[in-house]
Every structure is written in structure tokens, then in C-alpha cells.
Amino acid sequence: LSFQPGDTIIRAAWRQGIEIPHYCWHPGLSIAANCRMCLVEIKAQRPMMLPILAWDEKKKEYVDAVKPKLQPACQIEVTEGMDVSSTGKQAVEAQAAVQEFLLLNHPVDCPICDQAGECKLQDYWLAHQKKLKRKDTEPVHKPKAVRFGPTIVYDAERCIMCTRGVRFCDEVAKDHVLDMRERGNRNEITLSPGRELDHDYTLMTEHVCPVGALTSKDFRFKARVWFLRSAPGV
């Protein structure tokens, strides 16, 4: 692939029309590298190789070997001669594991979710052979239908903490109105004290959400994406 100086792996692939699975990365935002969905195998570079013991069928014993380290494609810059695989066995297994963790507490309410039909969670679940989660316990419950402003509603249970909305407000709208609180599976997006989401780019904040966590009051429960027609943007 051709690339420009400073391009990361995922951006270089994106320029060529190749999609590496991702949630938190967006071409117009800073790099967060927190979803770990874009893990890829980087080969033929010694610093990227991990020493392991591998079974040798001929010798019938374990021998010293190396395997590619998994690296986030959104964070690693491309170099000449770099050998990258996003579809290798280790990369696909890592992506499937990330997907499983994200779905542990995610409500399976796709039939009523406004993001259904254009949801990355749905797309990647289908891409990873529709694997079921192995943890059979009550999911963590969080606030639902939280009013974030005159036009936006937030569902914390659907949120995958990609921080796209937070970064968009900070970097594009220049309004630090969204933030994160708590940790682990209690993590959620919150409003700054005394504020609400009402800047000039409010609906674009909803648009960059890859799942159905941020929804528009005007659209909510009123239409499905497959009934809509596309039109050129401004």
C-alpha cells in the first residue's frame, strides 16, 4: 500500500478503501486507542516479534520461536516494508475477544435500536461467526434514556466507551461538555456540571457514535435507516 508520512496503519488502509475493524478511531479525531478492536499482526520486524515456545512436529518437542506482537493499527505509524495482517489467526481471535467483552453487558435490543442496520457491533458480530458470549450472568445495568440536551438522548447501557463523542466535542465543537466517570464496566459518559449538550454541532456528536448510545430525539423510534434515502452532504 502507498502511504503518506505520518500515516498510521489504519489510516493508510482507509485511504486505500481497506477497512480494519475499529470502534474508537475516526479520521477526523485524535487517536484514543482504547477499543483495541483494530489489533493487527506486524511481522518481519524484530521489535514487533514476541519470543515463544512452539511445538515442532518433526522434532516432537518445543523449540524457541517468535510470533508477531499484536499492535493497535490506529496507533502504529507505517514504515517502508512493514508486513501487516488484520486477518491472521491471532488478529481475528483478538478481535473476536474484544467483541465478546463489549457484548457482555450490551443490551440485545437491536429490533428497537435506532442504530440497527448501520451498527458496527452488528457488522463485526456477523463477521466473527456469530459467536455467543460465554458468561451467563446478569449484565450490569446503567442509566437509560438520559436527556443530554434539547435534541440528544443517551443510553449508558449501549455505550461502548469509544470516547468519539467526548473527543468530537473537545476537538471539533471546542466545547468540553462531555466527560467520562467511573471505571471498568461502571464507566459511562456524563455531562459537565451545570451543562447540557446544546452546541452548534450537537447532531454531529450523535452522528459519530458507532452504536446506539447517542440518539436524536427527532429520529428516535420514528424511522429505520433502510427506509431512508442518501443525499450529498454539505
Where are these regions (language model features)?
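Short, contiguous acidic and Ser/Thr-rich linear segments
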Residues: 1-7
